[in-house]
Regions:
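Charged low-complexity interaction tracts in eukaryotic proteins
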Residues: 2-13, 30, 37-77
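Hydrophobic residues on short alpha-helical segments
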Residues: 13-20
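Short helix-capping/hinge SLiMs at alpha-helix to coil transitions
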Residues: 21-25
Length: 77
């Protein structure tokens, strides 16, 4: 548990993986951003929602985990 009884937030790459697995398919950056923010899976350090740019940057840093194909992010299997 996090502070004041709130569950601990996922890291952004964990939140992306969670969304991809739960949806059972690849998703676009805007779709991932929407799901992560709707479910409050990850928040920025300032408490604001995640941006498309952050999701894109996370994909780019984790290309060993994710693959970009036709505008869609997939898990590497």
């Amino acid at each position: 548990m996090g502070y004041e009884g709130m569950p601990k937030q996922m890291r952004l790459e964990e939140a992306i993986m969670y969304c991809l697995v739960n949806e059972g398919r690849g998703l676009s950056v805007p779709q991932l951003t929407y799901l992560i923010n709707r479910e409050r899976l990850h928040r920025r350090k300032d408490g604001n929602p995640v941006t498309d740019e952050q999701v894109w940057a996370c994909y780019f840093r984790n290309r060993h985990t994710f693959v970009w194909e036709g505008g869609i992010i997939h898990l590497v299997m």
